[in-house]
């Protein structure tokens, strides 16, 4: 797929573009009821709301800006409520950090209704089901991001329900980390049923029982970093049993430019039938003989978290979007791909996030520039 240290662009298999809009680079995209919501990577760009009811002619209907020193690159929506993260850069300790809540009943005029303030850097990636927000904030007394569940029954007054952390993070409680710096920290939780599946960067992942949400209990943890160097980014449970077993797809994030020379990050298939003993049984990787740099990465990142069957769509940075069939979880099979042209004014592709709408359309956000609307023939 990629040879001589270069990656192809403008190629596809079983996935085609039906629309595109020039936008500043984004960290996340979600779609609901004909509107796409994009969290941008860098200030002053904060969040864009785009009318995508005509996918061939998407139109921006609102754009929120953000102060220098912050970014709000993650967004989630349910009904008339929109949540965006406020995460600050190290040099701007005086700026507020946390989770901002908006009323979006008027899509062209988002109205702030609450701000859940956190300590330190703020909130990274998170999920939201309309009632609860599952967030990854930095909190006072803890080393690095932890997992927190907020009750959003009244979105104007979010209330903490519970928190969970890896042993060693609660420094105010006398715990001592066994790792260096902030290597072990929550990336984001995903809920399925009464379980949270929590990616934990260089701490691997955790499965947490929230059947009693006021008292979360660890079911199991697993960490393969080291020996594998790239951090765990997303832990996504499959919708149904496959081959009469339960499965979770885990992506590590390609950050090779920050590490010694390594194989590019890839995807793991984990058997969670016995959830106290999660067992990796297979991997999926896109071959590449080049190197990641500060400007260009090639490796796994983020799957579409909307799961409808056995095929998942996964962003691969410079490798674009990959469609992977897990009908046989022991032998994951690529069944399609889409690698865009570089965005306006850009030299490389960095496919960062993807949303899979229930009507089948895919929304692919580039880290540098542009939102693509796609159709899959898979």
Residue ranges and their predicted role:
Residues 1-378:
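Feature marking well-ordered beta-strand scaffolds used for ligand recognition
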């Amino acid at each position: 797929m990629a040879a001589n240290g270069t990656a192809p662009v403008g190629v596809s298999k079983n996935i085609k573009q039906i629309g595109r809009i020039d936008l500043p680079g984004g960290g996340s995209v979600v779609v609901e009821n004909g509107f796409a919501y994009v969290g941008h990577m860098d200030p002053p760009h904060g969040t864009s709301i785009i009318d995508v009811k005509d996918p061939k002619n998407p139109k921006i209907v609102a754009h929120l800006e953000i102060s220098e020193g912050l970014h709000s690159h993650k967004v989630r929506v349910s009904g008339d409520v929109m949540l965006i993260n406020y995460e600050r850069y190290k040099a701007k300790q005086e700026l507020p950090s946390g989770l901002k809540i908006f009323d979006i009943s008027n899509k062209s005029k988002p109205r702030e209704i609450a701000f859940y303030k956190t300590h330190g850097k703020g909130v990274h990636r998170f999920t939201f089901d309309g009632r609860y927000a599952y967030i990854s904030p930095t909190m006072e007394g803890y080393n690095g991001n932890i997992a927190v569940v907020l009750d959003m029954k009244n979105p104007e007054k979010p209330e903490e329900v519970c928190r969970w952390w890896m042993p060693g993070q609660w420094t105010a409680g006398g715990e001592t980390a066994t790792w260096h710096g902030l290597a072990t920290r929550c990336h984001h939780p995903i809920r399925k049923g009464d379980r949270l599946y929590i990616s934990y960067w260089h701490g691997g992942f955790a499965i947490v029982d929230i059947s009693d949400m006021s008292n979360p209990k660890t079911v199991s943890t697993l960490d393969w970093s080291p020996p594998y160097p790239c951090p765990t980014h997303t832990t996504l449970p499959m919708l149904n049993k496959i081959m009469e077993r339960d499965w979770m797809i885990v992506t590590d994030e390609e950050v090779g430019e920050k590490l010694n020379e390594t194989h590019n990050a890839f995807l793991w298939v984990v058997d969670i039938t016995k959830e106290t003993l999660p067992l990796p049984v297979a991997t999926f990787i896109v071959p590449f003989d080049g190197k990641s740099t500060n400007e260009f990465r090639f490796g796994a990142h983020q799957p579409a978290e909307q799961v409808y069957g056995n095929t998942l769509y996964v962003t691969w940075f410079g490798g674009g979007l990959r469609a992977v069939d897990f009908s046989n979880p022991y032998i994951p099979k690529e069944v399609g791909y889409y690698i865009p042209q570089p965005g306006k004014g850009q030299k490389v592709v960095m496919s960062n996030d993807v949303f899979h709408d229930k009507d089948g359309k895919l929304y692919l956000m580039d880290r540098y520039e542009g939102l693509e609307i796609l159709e899959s023939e898979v």
